[in-house]
């Protein structure tokens, strides 16, 4: 488990705020939340369902309008208007009073309660109409705010509907449809063409492609094939190859697949993703911690100021009623509701948008930190490179053809399970197409050096330079091998009887997208990018040169990677570590933000990383950083708007320039503006290009 890193950050256990229900206390089979509670801890429902607060507000407005209109009707008793205003008070203040009582009983304080106090104060002064107007505008603003916030929340809740409610399971030789909650480990389920996959599992029968975009964000369907051993128990398998594994909520292609269930519905990747996204909403960012601290001192100061203003009549020649009215207007103006919602609304929208793009951001802290990065450290293998060796060069010697060289090499290496041998066979067959391969005999491995065998009655040796150190390898061949190794290749010589017939080179090649991704990151304002690897320095520098990364550090053990990240952190302050989330976990823990790639298939990566790129897609990184920088900018805008409105309204109400009506309109207006501003994050585009340095926009 990771612990806090900077800025008083909270542990990665994602605790839920005291006094509020967990957003995922009752997450069902696919993570459905029975009660999703917003940051303030309130979700309103009642006799009119989810629209109850809005309908109550409209009833309040109707009663207010009727009371105000009837007050101008000649001969109409004042009691009629008063009764209508009281009705307006009841419906306009119902939810505010309910929330305040619940919060106070838990030992907390509800800022919105200040509005209720102001309305009661207006009633005491006999200004029933203004008090009712205050409650109407306030309740209407709240209802619209909840509606707007629900749009962001629905983006998260949409994830819960990805997995189908039922599955077609094979039991006792026949197919039967059951609820996914009833699936057990080892069940065999049938996935029909173009249907959603109901559970995480491995393919037992059938070949086809699966659209994994809902989980990983991959735009191209992924080919699937059956596992080699269908009887094996894969439930505890840590590393299952992508071509064998399927996820709940993804969409099958045109083929019928039979899948063995390896995770119960409640533990599926989509279910855990929804839980983590819901919990992430509760994580407070540095800005939110600041606003909370600000409110802690600001609210008491406002209450003291309001109390003092009530006695202004002792100093100024005015009646008590006017002083009290001014104090209530200041109370309305100074209530920091917009400030309270400014950061949570942006965090919710940012986390929801990221989840739709296949990126899990675990709360406000990593969201903001990601937008402030100055440097990124990358693990090489599997992050900047493909993670597996590929046949890169086939160099025939002494008059032999490339085809004949490959036939001999494949014949020998296809009997080995060594990763380099597998790469030679795969790459060679791709080059040869359908040519038949002879059988090798007398195959014998030479540990650490190579392999020997017979093909067509001739003795074949394939291996590194050490295998041939006694053979007086010609100088020109040695030079070719050394040139390849300087370029980061692993080279092997092929000898047939007494003649060297070729050189084969292999390399963990850079990802095709790596170079462009690094350029995008540089355009986003990442000042320094380094590559960390356990490979030798020569290989590290060769890969770095190909992808355009300036700093490469090789020959690193896991503890050396930790030291490298710590050193980078001291010089650049805000550093991310990008890796697989497993082997790189120690280095990630020491970085400002730990980012794991390909996390959909790794439980460990989902738990250890601050940010998880669900698909094995490096191009998701610029999207996540661009989104985070956009979110950081919106949070700053919201702070200026919310604090600016308060800063303007307080002196205006103290001087009597603005009354309660305009004050509450400005107050509620600013709240809706910051929420609407935050919702812009939901429309953030994957390919949205931004040149931003340190979180500030610059002209492209």
Residue locations for each model-derived region?
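Juxtamembrane helix-loop transition segments at the membrane interface in multi-pass membrane proteins
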Residues: 101-109, 144-162, 345-364, 679-694
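Cytosolic catalytic headpiece
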Residues: 364-583, 587-593, 626-629, 688-700
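Conserved cytosolic catalytic loops of P-type ATPases
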Residues: 158-267, 365-409, 454
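Juxtamembrane coupling segments of multi-pass membrane pumps/enzymes
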Residues: 18, 110, 135-193, 221-231, ...
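Helix-interface capping motifs at the ends of transmembrane segments in multi-pass membrane proteins
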Residues: 62-90, 102-111, 116-131, 296-334, ...
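Membrane-embedded alpha-helical bundles of multi-pass transporters
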Residues: 69-74, 99-100, 105, 117, ...
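Flexible metal-binding regulatory segments at protein termini and peripheral loops
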Residues: 1-78, 158, 171-174, 221-223, ...
């Amino acid at each position: 488990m990771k612990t806090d890193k900077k800025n008083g950050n909270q542990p990665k256990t994602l605790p839920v705020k005291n006094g509020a229900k967990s957003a995922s206390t009752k997450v069902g089979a696919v993570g459905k939340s029975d009660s999703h509670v917003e940051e303030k801890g309130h979700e309103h429902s009642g006799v009119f369902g989810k629209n109850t607060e809005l309908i109550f507000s409209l009833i309040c407005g109707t009663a207010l309008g009727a009371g105000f209109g009837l007050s101008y009707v000649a001969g109409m008793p004042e009691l009629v208007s008063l009764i209508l205003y009281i009705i307006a008070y009841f419906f306009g203040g119902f939810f505010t009073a309910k929330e305040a009582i619940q919060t106070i009983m838990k030992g907390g304080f509800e800022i919105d309660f200040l509005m209720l106090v102001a309305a009661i104060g207006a009633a005491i002064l006999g200004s029933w109409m203004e008090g009712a107007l205050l409650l109407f505008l306030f309740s209407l603003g709240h209802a619209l705010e909840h509606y707007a916030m629900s749009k962001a929340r629905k983006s998260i809740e949409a994830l819960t509907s990805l997995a189908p409610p039922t599955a077609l399971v094979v039991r006792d030789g026949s197919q039967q449809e059951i609820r996914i909650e009833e699936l057990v480990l080892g069940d065999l389920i049938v996935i029909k063409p173009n249907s959603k996959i109901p559970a995480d599992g491995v393919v037992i029968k059938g070949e086809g492609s699966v659209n994994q975009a809902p989980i990983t964000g991959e735009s191209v369907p992924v080919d699937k094939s059956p596992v080699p051993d269908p009887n094996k128990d894969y439930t505890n398998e840590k590393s299952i190859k992508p071509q064998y594994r399927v996820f709940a909520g993804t969409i099958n292609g045109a083929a019928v697949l039979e899948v063995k269930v390896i995770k119960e519905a409640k533990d599926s990747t989509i279910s855990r993703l929804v839980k983590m996204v819901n919990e992430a909403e509760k994580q407070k960012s540095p800005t939110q911690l600041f606003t909370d601290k600000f409110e802690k001192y600001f609210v008491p100061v406002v209450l003291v100021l309001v109390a003092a203003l009530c006695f202004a009549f002792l100093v100024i020649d005015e009646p008590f009623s006017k002083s009290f009215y001014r104090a209530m207007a200041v109370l309305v103006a100074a209530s920091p509701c917009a400030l309270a919602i400014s950061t949570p609304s942006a965090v919710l929208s940012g986390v929801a948008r990221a989840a739709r793009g296949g990126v899990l951001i675990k709360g406000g802290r990593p969201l903001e930190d990601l937008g402030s990065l100055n440097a990124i450290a990358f693990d090489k293998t599997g992050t900047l490179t493909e993670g597996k060796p590929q046949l890169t060069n086939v160099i025939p010697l002494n008059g032999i053809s490339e085809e004949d060289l490959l036939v001999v090499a494949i014949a020998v290496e296809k009997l080995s399970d060594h990763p380099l041998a597998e790469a030679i066979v795969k790459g060679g067959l791709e080059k040869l197409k359908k040519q038949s391969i002879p059988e090798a005999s007398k195959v014998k491995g030479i540990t650490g050096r190579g392999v020997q065998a017979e093909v067509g009655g001739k003795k074949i040796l394939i291996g590194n330079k050490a295998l041939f150190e006694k053979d007086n390898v010609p100088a020109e061949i040695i030079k070719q091998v050394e040139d390849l190794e300087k370029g980061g290749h692993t080279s092997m010589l092929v000898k047939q009887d007494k003649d060297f017939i070729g050189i084969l080179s292999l390399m963990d090649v850079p990802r095709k997208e790596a170079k462009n991704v690094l350029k995008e990151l540089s355009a986003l304002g990442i000042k320094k990018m380094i590559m960390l690897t356990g490979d030798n320095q020569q290989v590290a520098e060769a890969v770095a040169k190909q992808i355009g990364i300036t700093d490469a550090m090789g020959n690193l053990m896991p503890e050396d990677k930790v030291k490298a990240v710590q050193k980078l952190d001291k010089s650049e302050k805000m550093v991310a570590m990008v890796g697989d989330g497993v082997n790189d976990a120690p280095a990630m823990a020491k970085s400002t933000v730990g980012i794991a790639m390909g996390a959909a298939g790794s439980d460990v990566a989902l738990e250890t990383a601050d940010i998880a790129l669900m698909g094995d897609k490096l191009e998701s990184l610029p999207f996540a950083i661009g989104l985070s920088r956009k979110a950081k900018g919106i949070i700053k805008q919201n702070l200026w708007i919310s604090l600016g409105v308060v800063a303007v309204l307080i002196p205006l109400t103290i001087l009597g320039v603005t009354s309660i009506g305009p004050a509450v309109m400005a107050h509620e207006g600013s709240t809706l503006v910051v929420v609407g501003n935050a919702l812009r994050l939901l429309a953030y585009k994957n390919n949205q290009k931004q040149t931003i340095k340190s979180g500030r926009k610059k002209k492209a």
